[in-house]
């Protein structure tokens, strides 16, 4: 890299080629080019609007920037190896197109407020895309749940069977997680959508700019009130990475369950060929690569969040070159979340089939109805703790005898406590166990049906 940089006039010697490569960000911040062009067009219009440059010059700049946009979209814009970053690459090409007037674009602007603007425009756009993908993911969850209101599945605590639940209820738990993710991104958007443009390098500018004018052109809700804060703030990126990490947590939890459910030990779901792979040595294998990759990629997003926190923790005001390191992790996190949402949505919609007969069997082969025996006694006046202790002994005795609760004779029940009657068998049937939990937010069929209606209304708004 031997050509002069825009800032090189103060220096007596050229930048060492290895240092130039180390310093350059064009290899990754080219991702921001569309946003850099949009922000620069708004800046050019503002310069003309305030009389800092002429209207004709403003029009030339806007047109030249639009030409670069078209060149980029057509694959014809190729920044040279001497381009330090996307900002210099655009300015260099603009000057080639419109001549010396292109050198006026950077009036009253620093790369510090410029890159902050670009990054916010990029992230604002990506957040909307992720929110749309979340809605699609939620929609698929509801499509499946609506078919399985009365399909029962074992519910677990400590990965031990606890109580049976409606499969729809189980899926709605993930819907609610995704809803919080969707809302959280909306919260982040409000702090992303603040304009730093016009903050300059750190202290503002001597030119009579109109920051509100550019903010309006770029659809920002407000402007930074402090120029030092405006150029050095990356809270918005950290907040996004926190939200992205939580999205991946939720996807990873679902992925883990799909992996378990598809195993021979569970056999709750069948993975279809379109969303599974095989083994290079074991011909019988069908591997759950999609959920495994989602589970694995979660660590990438966590890592980018941690990296950003470490970058920011010791930075004095205002801009520091460390902030160049905010982008690759941010870009990768955005791409990882979008790809993971898409993959899990496809897996649910096209690659997964619940084995309803196996699920029906699974909810009858354990003691997950034991709580309902205690509830049965409590409803008949027996103190719950006394009933709880009694049922614990019954379970212990039944296990020793190789029986389930449903296998006990009525005489055996009544020997345990006279409150037991013939209706105990209905009370502890899996279907009744689920139906009886009719409290708001519970797994009872009536409540689940109401929850599905409410959830559908949420995403249809």
UniProtKB/Swiss-Prot annotation:
The keyword Lyase applies. Its EC number is 4.3.2.1. SUPFAM superfamilies: L-aspartase-like (SSF48557). One of its GO terms (biological process) is L-arginine biosynthetic process. InterPro entries: Arg_succ_lyase_C, Argininosuccinate_lyase, Fumarase/histidase_N, Fumarate_lyase_CS, Fumarate_lyase_fam, Fumarate_lyase_N, L-Aspartase-like. Pathway: Amino-acid biosynthesis; L-arginine biosynthesis; L-arginine from L-ornithine and carbamoyl phosphate: step 3/3. GO terms for molecular function: argininosuccinate lyase activity. It is found in: Cytoplasm. It catalyses: 2-(N(omega)-L-arginino)succinate = fumarate + L-arginine. It is an enzyme of class 4 (lyase). One of its GO terms (cellular component) is cytosol. Keywords: Amino-acid biosynthesis, Arginine biosynthesis, Cytoplasm, Lyase. Gene3D superfamilies: Fumarase/aspartase (C-terminal domain) (1.10.40.30), Fumarase/aspartase (Central domain) (1.20.200.10), Fumarase/aspartase (N-terminal domain) (1.10.275.10). Pfam families: ASL_C2, Lyase_1. HAMAP family: Arg_succ_lyase. Belongs to the lyase 1 family. Argininosuccinate lyase subfamily. Homotetramer. This is Argininosuccinate lyase. The gene is argH.
């Amino acid at each position: 890299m031997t050509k002069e940089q825009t800032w090189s006039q103060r220096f007596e010697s050229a930048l060492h080629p290895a240092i130039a490569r180390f310093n350059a960000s064009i290899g990754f911040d080219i991702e921001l080019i569309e946003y850099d062009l949009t922000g620069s067009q708004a800046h050019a219009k503002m310069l003309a609007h305030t009389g800092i440059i002429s209207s004709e010059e403003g029009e030339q700049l806007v047109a030249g920037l639009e030409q670069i946009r078209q060149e980029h979209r057509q694959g014809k814009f190729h920044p040279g190896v001497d381009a330090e970053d996307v900002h210099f690459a655009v300015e260099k090409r603009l000057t080639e197109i419109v001549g010396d007037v292109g050198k006026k674009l950077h009036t009253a602007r620093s790369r510090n407020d410029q890159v902050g603007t670009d990054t916010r425009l990029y992230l604002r756009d990506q957040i909307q895309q992720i929110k749309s993908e979340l809605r699609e993911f939620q929609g698929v969850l509801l499509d499946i749940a609506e078919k399985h209101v009365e399909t029962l599945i074992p519910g677990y605590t400590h990965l031990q069977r606890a109580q049976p639940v409606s499969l729809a209820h189980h899926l709605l738990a993930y819907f609610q997680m995704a809803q919080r993710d969707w809302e959280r991104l909306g919260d982040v958007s409000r702090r992303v959508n603040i304009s730093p443009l016009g903050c300059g390098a750190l202290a503002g500018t001597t030119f009579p700019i109109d920051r509100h004018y550019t903010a309006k052109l770029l659809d920002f809700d407000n402007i930074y009130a402090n120029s030092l804060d405006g150029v050095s703030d990356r809270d918005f990126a950290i907040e996004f990475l926190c939200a992205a990490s939580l999205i991946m947590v939720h996807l990873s939890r679902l992925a883990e369950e799909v992996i378990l459910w598809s195993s021979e030990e569970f056999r709750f779901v069948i993975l279809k060929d379109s969303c599974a792979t095989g083994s290079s040595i074991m011909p019988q294998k069908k591997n759950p690569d999609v959920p495994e990759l989602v589970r694995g990629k979660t660590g990438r997003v966590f890592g980018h969040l941690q990296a950003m926190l470490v970058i920011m923790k010791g930075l004095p005001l205002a801009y520091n070159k460390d902030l160049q390191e905010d982008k690759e992790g941010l870009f990768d996190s955005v791409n990882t979340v979008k790809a993971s949402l898409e993959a899990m949505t496809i897996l649910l919609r096209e690659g997964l089939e619940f084995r309803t007969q196996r699920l029906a069997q699974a909810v009858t082969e354990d003691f997950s109805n034991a709580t309902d025996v205690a509830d049965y006694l409590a409803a008949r006046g027996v103190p719950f703790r006394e009933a709880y202790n009694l049922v614990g002994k019954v379970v212990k005795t039944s296990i020793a005898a190789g029986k389930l609760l449903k296998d006990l004779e009525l005489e055996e029940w009544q020997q345990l406590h006279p409150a037991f009657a013939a209706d105990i068998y209905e009370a502890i049937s899996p279907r009744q166990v689920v139906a009886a939990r009719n409290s708001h937010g519970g797994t009872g069929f009536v409540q689940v049906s109401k929850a599905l209606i409410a959830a559908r209304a949420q995403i249809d708004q």
